[in-house]
Amino acid sequence: MTNTETAVFGMGCFWSAEELFRKIKGVISTEVGFMGGTVKNPTYGQVCRGKSGHIEVVNITYNPKIVKYTDLLNLFWNNHDPTTPNRQGWDVGEQYSSHIFYFTEEQRLLAEKSFEKIQKSSDLRIVTAIKKASDFFPAEEYHQKYFMKKNNSILNF
C-alpha cells in the first residue's frame, strides 16, 4: 500500500475545487463535502442555508512522493480569490469562505508560510482561515465528481 496524505481546502464551490485537484498527477482521490461546522452529517441544504457552520471543501488523498503539499497549496492560492470573505465569484455565503484545514504540524507550518508569502505579495488583506481539520462529512453522491459526470467542465484548468 502506498503511503498517502490528506489535504482539505475550502475555496468556494466544491465542484470547481474537485475538478482542479482530481486532474493532478499524484492525487489518488478527491471527495467533496463539508468541514468545520457544528452539525453532524449535514445536508447540502443545511449548509447552504447557513444552518450548520460548515465550509464546502474538497478532501484530497495524495501520494507525497509524487505531489508535494506545497504544490497543492500553490494550486489552492492560484485558483481562487483569498481576499473576499464568504464569497467566491457569484457564490456568496459562509460556506464558500477560503480555508486551509491541516492535519499535521508540518501542514500547519507550510500553510502559514504560504499565507505569509501571499499576503506580502498582495495589496489586499488575505482572509483565508487556517484551521485544524475536524470531522469531514461527504456531500451527497450527486455532488461527487460533478463536472466529470456532466462532461460539461466549463473550467479551464
From Swiss-Prot:
GO terms for biological process: protein modification process. It catalyses: L-methionyl-[protein] + [thioredoxin]-disulfide + H2O = L-methionyl-(S)-S-oxide-[protein] + [thioredoxin]-dithiol; [thioredoxin]-disulfide + L-methionine + H2O = L-methionine (S)-S-oxide + [thioredoxin]-dithiol. GO terms for molecular function: L-methionine:thioredoxin-disulfide S-oxidoreductase activity; peptide-methionine (S)-S-oxide reductase activity. It is an enzyme of class 1 (oxidoreductase). The active site is at 13. It comes from the Archaea. PANTHER family: PEPTIDE METHIONINE SULFOXIDE REDUCTASE, PEPTIDE METHIONINE SULFOXIDE REDUCTASE MSRA 2. This is Peptide methionine sulfoxide reductase MsrA. It comes from Methanococcus maripaludis (strain C5 / ATCC BAA-1333). The gene is msrA.
